[in-house]
Amino acid sequence: MLSIDIVGLTGACSYALDCIEAELVNIKNKHGKRVAYISIRMAEYWKIQGDELQDLAMCALLHDNALTQYISEELKKDSVIDLKKDLSEEKTNLHCIYGEKNITKLPFKTDVTNVILYHHEHADGTGPFQKKWNEIPLFARIIHLADIIDIIRNSIDSDDNSWDFMCQYLSKNKDSLFDSECVNAFLHVFTKESFMCLSDDSFETKLWKAIPREKLVFDWEMCKDVADFFAKIVDYKSSFTSRHSIGVAEKASMLAQYMGYDSITVQKMYLAGALHDIGKMAVGNEILEKPDKLTDDEFSKMKNHAGYTYLILSEVNDFEEIRDWAAFHHEKLNGKGYPFGKTAAELNEPERMMACVDIYQALTEDRPYKKGLSHEKTCDILDDMAQKDFIDSDISKIIRECFGRNR
């Protein structure tokens, strides 16, 4: 059984989602964490604690978990979409539907049914699903208000007048956009001073101190569900890498099992594989999907994705091993890999395995601009890379055996 800091992992995913929102809809970084912080502060009004508080925080951190999926689905219909319009009006319900479905397999301790689905509903029933406030879960109502508060805070100047503006906005939209109970809760726990503090990073320390961060013990199925949830978010970022993270996760765990590793390590390899490209959430699609050769500057930004993976996963308590297996997948034995320039002496076997599996998966999978290579051709390329001291020759040989079975 694998023990995981699920709140920390959720926070790490929130950071990655925030990078997408900053890129596409001009919402500054840490939006998800601010929504979570505002939500748990409002929870004080109802004296929400323990498991309920943790689940509220997780829902708030993941309230826009389907953003990349929504964009991917819409781009299949239309090569150009107006995100600022579509994400706020008639198609808002789509990312709510996707998001609600996505979280069903996450290990919540309480009932969070319809929290993500209805987090854009209006108190007067004019929202996407036309639910009135008394038909909407409390957590959804809290997150809705917190979400709008942070979006507006992001769009106005943070000065002495911003608090007065926010109070006037809430008063104007009370019982229409927001229910009176949630408005009262916000005004009960926030003052001008605490509201102004949302503009700096001090709120984040307070957020992590306030949320219970008990580790959860995962069996294989739970681990796979959580890993697949995060991999899905990453893979929807770009049509060029659809299912890449899932493929790496499956093959990394298969290889670990074939090489005789214990069940915990097999689970860790699956999770590391699912998360290895989470740093790509911080890289713009104009680079990820550029059909032409990248410029030196663009390639430098692309190489940063593994460093972002390291940075993002560093937020998770006691996750160093999985973080390193995930983040070092572009390192080379000769020290000429990236982003850290690790040498053979600094790369353990699981890290070497992940590097090999990532290359194998990238070469064998179909992409919009190329057909995947055969197993034999891919293994020949791996052998050539091993001879050049890029990757581990022993692992390259084992991959030929392991992935060549039943072909």
What are these regions (language model features)?
Residues L2-R407:
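Histidine- and acidic-residue-rich, metal-dependent catalytic cores
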